[in-house]
Amino acid sequence: MNTLIFGIVFGFLLARYRFCFFSGFRNLFYFKDFSFVSALSFCIFLQSLGLFTLEYFKLITIPEFKFSILATIIGSFAFGIGMAFSKACVSGSFTRVINNSSYLITAFSFAFSMALFNGIFKKYIDIFTKNELTNIHTFLNISPFILVILLGILSIYLIYKAKKISILAIVLAILSLLMWKMIGFSFTLSVPSKNMILYLVTNQYRYLDSGVYFLFGCILGGIVANLKSFSLQGVSLKQGYFSVIGGFLMAFGASLASGCNVANILIASAYFSFQAFIFLPFMLFGFLIILRRVS
């Protein structure tokens, strides 16, 4: 039940305040608008400070797992391409399913494809996933608080560029830290979307885990936030195709990179996962290549 409530709040906040990776990065590169990246970096900094403080007092355990560099590079690049095609990120699609048919198509395509890549196609995904690296501070054998300070300096610079402090970033960071303390993990969408499809298809309750409840809550929170703008506007056949392709590519990328933009950028960056800092530049590379051609 706790994860459902956290999901509702998370989905409501993202939908109500339009916290979207697609529009945020698009606005940064096209209009030099630093609002989103400023809020994102500030949220990551606050989470990082809170996470390592909680770990220092032995109140939580920060995850540490190895990952494949090649799989992350390929996956993040494919994810960025998919985000550009669908004109939405994963979180934006799930929290705005009643706003536009393209979001609904993207969300369904992503969830269904996640089930495929973790089902009959899993053996092909596993070819790329040879574990190699872990978290940055562990690899460098330094205190994580050194990296927290550097992240704080970057956040201050981006806040200066944006000329404002995001209250939403503070709220999301607090929400994330509460989830870590109460549940043991934070915001997650990719694996729960796979499990949601498997539960709906098989009716096996083993798939109905806390992550699925979080995703259900996220969708519900987005619906509540967007009730006044309920539309389900139709989309062109071309954008419909792009939404299907985008959802498929984002699922392929998330399967290889062990998570979507939320898990890898918003959350894993806060505990300095090498994977997160490899994911971001290659995702942006794929995103920008296609965005210029489909805009």
Residue ranges of predicted features:
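Membrane-interfacial helix-loop segments of redox and metal-homeostasis proteins
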Residues: 1-295
